[in-house]
């Protein structure tokens, strides 16, 4: 005899589904939820439909099926509107649940829908749903989520961003993310924070040691990041060193310290490099700014080390943008540009507001002699973060395109943000040095920058290149030698070798190329320089040799693009005379 199924108890099934979701048993919840939502509507009340679709959406969200969960959250919201928000629907009063707070449930659904849109990179739609929740009805999570989205958008929403972060602090005075973000924006956090702390401690009925909130240690850290946002790395560095003296193995502090050294006027790449290595020793799977570290590894042509970092990041953080920009750098070093672009696009798809990914994409496209294609990426990077690194690449692109006015605007913008910063002065000098009629002014600015910081690598390289262009050969050598005495690097030896090569001092050039390779045997610019020098010493014109190779490649591929390549190469040659 075939056993009959018992009567379906929808309310009990929904209760079981809620237990599974709250226990984070999402696979089991999806399995049960499929049965709940498939019960015919005649056997369910509209209220039960609202709850079951919402819980089913929760189970799918927990399984990272964001597009599917979005569908069911919206379905739940649609039914909610039909039942509770339709004033003409008087016949359905029996379908309403008296003790059900439909407005609060509506806001919770809108928040869940916004999270789905964030996960699938539809941030504008996410913001529209969050903004439809009345301000007074927004909870801590809603305020924090919308503040993050406003922050990603940038200046256009800065006022709303500040208001949202302040509401977060009112609700939770220990939200360090909100405190840091507000201080980075230059806001007086204490006006909100102190009353919020007092209210919190009074609410908890005592001032005993378990309830006292201590944020005295965060002030210096927040201020250091504010100085970084203002392009004042020296001030940031001083503050971070004080924090680091108390928390010497704090990974976040070490990361910010490494970045401060990177942006600093003095040649601090070695300090940056060493701090990142310390972070890797403490935690090889730490993700913060690891793509910046990988860019330093690429710059030094350290392929094995770069590969190791990429493997660790892919294994531990496959859903982070930094992972895929790091992988893109690895392929860029291997000259696999197609793979490099593929991975940098993957990084952008994960986090569109990651400025380094846009900057790297622009750099890759510039390497392909495609400055017009590179320009939007570099402009987006500069829009997201106005710092010397994003400005330098954008200026370089404008110069290649012979857009002197645009290059000058970018250089002046970054220089106005930090007028006493040698690197920004060097960038402005570089733009002016590209215009023969402005070279005298460029020299004044670069000389002032060098006085401000005698060992700023950007200034030294820019001024030495200007000296070479104007025929001041010995001055170029002297300034580079002075830098070399201060800090011996593979870069500086290679630069000096290049200057000697322009004057046909082959023996001196060879000495410095070899010295660069002694410091770093994998340093690609030095290897290329030696290869070029060896051709010259054999009486072979290396440029003619390269042109011949390009002609052969064009004939093999049947592409008639040689004239354009030559024009692009000419642009790059002019640009390379100034750009460090």
UniProtKB/Swiss-Prot annotation:
What Gene Ontology biological process does one annotation of this record name?
cell division
Organism of this sequence: Dictyostelium discoideum (Social amoeba)
Looking up Pfam families in the UniProt record yields: TPR_8 (PF13181)
> What InterPro entries does the record tag this protein with?
TPR-like_helical_dom_sf, TPR_rpt
Biased region (Acidic residues) positions are: 542-580
Q: Which locations, inside or outside the cell, does it occupy?
A: Nucleus
What UniProt keywords apply to this chain's record, in alphabetical order? Answer: Cell cycle, Cell division, Mitosis, Nucleus, Repeat, TPR repeat, Ubl conjugation pathway
Protein name, please?
Answer: Anaphase-promoting complex subunit 7
Predominantly, its location class is nucleus
- Extract the SUPFAM superfamilies matched here: TPR-like
How does this protein assemble? The APC/C is composed of at least 13 subunits that stay tightly associated throughout the cell cycle: anapc1, anapc2, anapc3, anapc4, anapc5, anapc6, anapc7, anapc8, anapc10, anapc11, cdc20, cdc26 and cdh1.
Entry annotated with the keyword Repeat: yes
Q: Which PANTHER family match?
A: ANAPHASE-PROMOTING COMPLEX SUBUNIT 7, CELL DIVISION CYCLE 16,23,27
Q: Which domain of life is it from?
A: Eukaryota
- Does the keyword Kinase belong to this entry? no
Region Disordered: list its residue ranges.
Answer: 539-580
List the GO terms this entry assigns under cellular component, sorted alphabetically: nucleus
Lineage at the top is: Eukaryota, Amoebozoa, Evosea, Eumycetozoa, Dictyostelia
Q: Where are the TPR repeats?
A: 50-83, 107-140, 141-175, 253-286, 321-354, 356-388, 390-421, 422-456, 458-490, 491-523
Q: What does this protein do?
A: Component of the anaphase promoting complex/cyclosome (APC/C), a cell cycle-regulated E3 ubiquitin-protein ligase complex that controls progression through mitosis and the G1 phase of the cell cycle.
**Pathway, per Swiss-Prot/TrEMBL?**
Protein modification; protein ubiquitination
């Amino acid at each position: 005899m075939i056993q009959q199924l018992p009567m379906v108890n929808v309310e009990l099934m929904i209760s079981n589904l809620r237990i599974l979701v709250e226990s984070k048993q999402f696979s089991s919840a999806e399995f049960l939820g499929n049965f709940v939502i498939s019960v015919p509507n005649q056997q369910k009340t509209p209220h039960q439909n609202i709850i079951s679709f919402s819980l089913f959406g929760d189970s799918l969200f927990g399984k990272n099926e964001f597009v599917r969960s979005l569908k069911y959250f919206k379905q739940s919201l649609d039914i909610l509107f039909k039942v509770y928000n339709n004033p003409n629907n008087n016949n359905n009063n029996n379908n309403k649940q008296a003790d059900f707070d439909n407005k609060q449930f509506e806001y919770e659904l809108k928040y869940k829908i916004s999270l789905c849109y964030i996960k699938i990179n539809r941030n504008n739609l996410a913001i529209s749903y969050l903004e439809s929740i009345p301000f007074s009805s927004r909870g801590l999570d809603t305020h924090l989520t919308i503040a993050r989205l406003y922050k990603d958008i940038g200046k256009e929403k800065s006022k709303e961003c500040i208001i949202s972060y302040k509401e977060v602090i009112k609700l939770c005075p220990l939200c360090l993310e909100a405190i840091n973000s507000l201080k980075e924006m230059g806001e007086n956090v204490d006006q909100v924070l102190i009353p919020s702390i007092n209210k919190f401690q009074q609410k908890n009925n005592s001032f005993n040691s378990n309830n006292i909130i201590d944020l005295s240690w965060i002030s210096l850290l927040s201020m250091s990041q504010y100085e970084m946002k203002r392009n004042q790395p020296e001030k940031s560095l001083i503050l971070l060193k004080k924090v680091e003296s108390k928390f010497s193995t704090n990974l976040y502090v070490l990361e910010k310290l490494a970045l401060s050294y990177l942006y600093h006027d003095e040649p601090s790449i070695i300090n940056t490099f060493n701090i990142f290595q310390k972070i890797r020793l403490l935690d090889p799977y730490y993700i913060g700014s690891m793509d910046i570290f990988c860019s330093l590894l690429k710059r030094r042509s350290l392929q094995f080390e770069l590969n190791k970092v990429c493997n660790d990041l892919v294994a531990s953080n496959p859903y982070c943008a930094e992972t895929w920009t790091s992988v893109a750098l690895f392929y860029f070093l291997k000259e696999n540009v197609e793979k490099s672009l593929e991975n940098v696009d993957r990084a952008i798809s994960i986090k569109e507001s990651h400025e380094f990914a846009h900057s790297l994409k622009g750099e890759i496209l510039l390497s392909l002699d495609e400055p017009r294609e590179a320009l939007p990426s570099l402009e987006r990077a500069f829009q997201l973060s106005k710092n010397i690194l994003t400005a330098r690449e954008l200026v370089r692109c404008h110069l290649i395109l012979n857009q002197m006015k645009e290059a000058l605007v970018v250089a002046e913008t970054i220089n106005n943000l930090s007028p006493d910063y040698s690197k920004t002065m060097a960038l402005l000098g570089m733009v002016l040095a590209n215009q023969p009629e402005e070279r005298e002014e460029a020299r004044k600015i670069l000389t002032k920058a060098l006085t401000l910081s005698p060992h700023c690598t950007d200034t030294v390289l820019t001024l030495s290149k200007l000296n070479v262009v104007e025929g001041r050969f010995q001055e170029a050598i002297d300034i580079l030698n002075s830098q070399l005495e201060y800090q011996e690097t593979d870069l500086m030896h290679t630069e000096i070798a290049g200057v000697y090569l322009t004057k046909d001092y082959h023996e001196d050039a060879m000495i410095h190329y070899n010295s660069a390779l002694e410091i770093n045997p994998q340093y690609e610019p030095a290897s290329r320089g030696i290869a070029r020098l060896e051709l010259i010493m054999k009486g072979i014109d290396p440029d003619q040799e390269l042109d011949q190779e390009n002609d052969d490649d064009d004939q093999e591929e049947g592409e008639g693009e040689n004239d354009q390549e030559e024009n692009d190469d000419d642009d790059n040659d002019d640009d390379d005379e100034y750009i460090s």
